[in-house]
Amino acid sequence: MAVYTDINEIELGAFLRHYDIGTLTSYKGIAEGVENSNYLLHTSSGSFILTLYEKRTNREDLPFFLGLMQHLAKRGLECPQPVVRNDGAMIGQLAGRPAAIVTFLEGMWMRRPTVAHCEAVGEGLAHMHLAGADFPMRRRNGLTLPDWRPLWNLSRKCADTVERGLVAETEADLDFLEKNWPADLPQGVIHADLFPDNAFFLGDRLSGFIDFYFACTDILAYDVAVCLNAWCFEKDFSYNRTKGAALLRGYTSVRPLSEAEADALPVLARGAAVRFMLTRLYDWLTVPAGSFVVKKDPMEYVRRMRFHRQIESAAEYGLEMQGVAA
């Protein structure tokens, strides 16, 4: 979450007249994040999050994102719920931006996730996949295999300035993924960006997921692969198999993986590492100093790519046989 668009109390008050959430008592910007402008609102009836959607978010996708949160909450998944305006809409206009209000989710994200946190996230992700199974809307993943080569081409010329040999490495990975990407695996709604800062905890208990603005329809096991990359590597870039086993155990306790999904996990994890390396690399090379966009080191994901190249089976990530459906 972040603040790119400033708002004043007068325009905020006018905006809030379209909602039945009580009287505004205070508001403040939330500094973390990169995509949209976010404010914490305190009113006489509770706390809420106000989001102003910036240029990186396609307005046409907002009904999918907000509708998904509404659907998941109705299915019992802990996540922010969109607050419906008095006119029945979920999206308004504030400071020249599309804007929405969602309920406040209690908890904190874990900067150093433990094994217990990883298991809870795996279990929660599986519950999300099951809860989203009957969500009627679809959204194409705009950052999946067919999109990686065009994105890479925007950075390719300068990639070796980040590390010598990165062009050859990335070309080889893309060639491999294009030849080996799995087909016919179970699909559904995925979060697609479930990093530690998008999962809240109260102690070791998962209190819910936030930031569904990359959610889409894609391979369910790809979401698991994203989480292995996001949750199970240490600061020294080593893979923590104990955390990986816990995450996979949590997931498969709710939704066992098929044999085909388990077999595909090394390719999916390698692809997820490439996806996040490419977006980081593009921002690293193109975002000017002083920009609001926080640049993240692409080399963290180059090291993950190198790790996944050595993996031959999901067992090496910690997947146990009882987690695979017969």
UniProtKB/Swiss-Prot annotation:
Name assigned to this protein: Homoserine kinase
Origin superkingdom: Bacteria
Transmembrane segments: none
Catalytic activity, EC: 2.7.1.39
Keyword Nucleotide-binding: yes
One Gene Ontology term from the biological process aspect of the record: threonine biosynthetic process
Organismal lineage: Bacteria, Pseudomonadati, Pseudomonadota, Alphaproteobacteria, Hyphomicrobiales
Single GO MF descriptor: homoserine kinase activity
Catalysed reactions listed for this entry: L-homoserine + ATP = O-phospho-L-homoserine + ADP + H(+)
InterPro entries noted in UniProt: Aminoglycoside_PTrfase, Homoserine_kinase_II, Kinase-like_dom_sf, Pseudomonas-type_ThrB
Cited Gene3D superfamilies: 3.90.1200.10, Phosphorylase Kinase, domain 1
Pathway: Amino-acid biosynthesis; L-threonine biosynthesis; L-threonine from L-aspartate: step 4/5
Keywords assigned by UniProt, alphabetized: Amino-acid biosynthesis, ATP-binding, Kinase, Nucleotide-binding, Threonine biosynthesis, Transferase
A Pfam family recorded for this sequence: APH
Residues forming coiled coils: none
Disulfide pattern: none
Species of origin: Brucella canis (strain ATCC 23365 / NCTC 10854 / RM-666)
Family: Belongs to the pseudomonas-type ThrB family.
